[in-house]
């Protein structure tokens, strides 16, 4: 999802999927005004006749032409602003390749002619929005999950861990286990239906084995969902089985630690002196941390991993779906931030590599 708006606002004005759709077939009716590409919600609503592409994979931009289309759509159709009149703050994944940061900077200054630009790490902004400058952020979105330890406002690069398991993988896994129940979803359009089922009905079990046992003995957790064609499907233990993969990536055939173990591993990579503050400030952010029960389960798992004397505290703010954006809104409206921007003049003098000197 792309979230866009104005500094100082308490929520983004525009939230739309970061997708670009192109017609599968050439339009046969002349004058129908079929465009060669559609972005965001419009691509979503016309998905039946389009091929959808995601320019961002695992949090990192892979297709710059499509990304440019998304930014163009953001400025002109969603926010309705002239980019040359507004400084722009973009967010990036931790460990974003250097060339990617330069490319973002170049497109903003050369294609969109912005007067000033800045790029910040998503997790750091989430922490700001929770009113902290020290803590460890578990940020899980659609394409990637990161655990980022932050001390006094600076991320600790040696402790940053990335897990290539996030919302999109859970949607795919839910598609798979629903097909075992006899409901088949295959196309990119049907995947969106499954994503909706996931967002509305899935939750995290506090004790997976216990929940499996309970669900096999009673139908209390079964819920029904009406598909767009009117067919009603029933979903039972899939509600928590799909999301369990966050804690047990082996369910997806991934040889990786779950979000609990990854958070613990990240803390262990940090200096002894800061661990206590990290354990006491574990902040969740991103849409994939929105499942009911996730904070309680994290509390239970991290407490079991941590030394017994440690006080573990999980912070899961209700607005965490947008906390990266909110942190950006706060940062960009601070008077002290105004000297941080990369100006058009600085860019013209130094070129794209200036981003490494001014944004860290």
UniProtKB/Swiss-Prot annotation:
Key words of the record = ATP-binding, Cytoplasm, Cytoskeleton, Hydrolase, Nucleotide-binding
Instruction: State the InterPro entries in the record.
Output: Actin, Actin/actin-like_CS, Actin_CS, ATPase_NBD
Q: Which GO terms describe its molecular function?
A: ATP binding; hydrolase activity
Q: What is its EC number?
A: 3.6.4.-
PROSITE patterns associated with the record: ACTINS_1 (PS00406), ACTINS_2 (PS00432), ACTINS_ACT_LIKE (PS01132)
Q: Does the keyword rRNA processing apply?
A: no
Q: Does the keyword Nucleotide-binding apply?
A: yes
Q: Name one GO cellular component term.
A: cytoplasm
- State the reactions this protein catalyses: ATP + H2O = ADP + phosphate + H(+)
* Subcellular locations according to the entry: Cytoplasm, Cytoskeleton
* Matching CDD domains: ASKHA_NBD_actin
| Source organism superkingdom | Eukaryota
**Protein family:** Belongs to the actin family.
Q: What does this protein do?
A: Actins are highly conserved proteins that are involved in various types of cell motility and are ubiquitously expressed in all eukaryotic cells.
Q: Indicate what this protein is called per its UniProt record.
A: Actin
């Amino acid at each position: 999802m792309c979230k866009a708006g104005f500094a100082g606002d308490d929520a983004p004005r525009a939230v739309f999927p970061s997708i670009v759709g192109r017609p599968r077939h050439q339009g046969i009716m002349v004058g129908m005004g079929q465009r060669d590409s559609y972005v965001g919600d419009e691509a979503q609503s016309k998905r039946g006749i389009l091929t959808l592409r995601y320019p961002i994979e695992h949090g990192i931009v892979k297709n710059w032409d499509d990304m440019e289309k998304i930014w163009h759509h953001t400025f002109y159709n969603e926010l309705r602003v002239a980019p040359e009149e507004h400084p722009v703050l973009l967010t990036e994944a931790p460990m974003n390749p250097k060339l990617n940061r330069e490319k973002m900077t170049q497109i903003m200054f050369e294609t969109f002619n912005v007067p000033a630009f800045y790029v910040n790490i998503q997790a750091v902004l989430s922490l700001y929005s929770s009113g902290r400058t020290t803590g460890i952020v578990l940020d899980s979105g659609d394409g990637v999950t990161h655990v980022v330890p932050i001390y006094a406002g600076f991320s600790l690069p040696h402790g940053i861990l990335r897990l290539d398991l996030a919302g999109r993988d859970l949607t795919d896994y839910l598609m798979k286990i629903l097909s075992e129940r006899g409901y088949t979803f295959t196309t990119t359009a049907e995947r969106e239906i499954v994503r909706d089922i996931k967002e509305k009905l899935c939750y995290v079990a506090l004790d997976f084995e216990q929940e499996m046992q309970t669900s096999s003995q009673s139908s209390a957790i079964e819920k029904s969902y009406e598909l767009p064609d009117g067919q009603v499907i029933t979903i039972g233990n899939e509600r928590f089985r799909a999301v369990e993969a966050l804690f047990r990536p082996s369910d997806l055939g991934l040889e990786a630690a779950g979000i609990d173990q990854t958070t613990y591993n990240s803390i262990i990579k940090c200096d002894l002196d800061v661990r206590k503050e990290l354990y006491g400030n574990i902040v969740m952010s991103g849409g994939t941390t929105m499942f009911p029960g996730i904070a309680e389960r994290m509390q239970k798992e991290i407490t079991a991993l941590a030394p017994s004397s440690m006080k573990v505290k999980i912070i899961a703010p209700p607005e965490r779906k947008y906390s990266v954006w909110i942190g950006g809104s706060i940062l960009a409206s601070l008077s002290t931030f105004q000297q941080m921007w990369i100006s058009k003049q600085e860019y013209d003098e130094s070129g794209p590599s200036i981003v490494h000197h001014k944004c860290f």
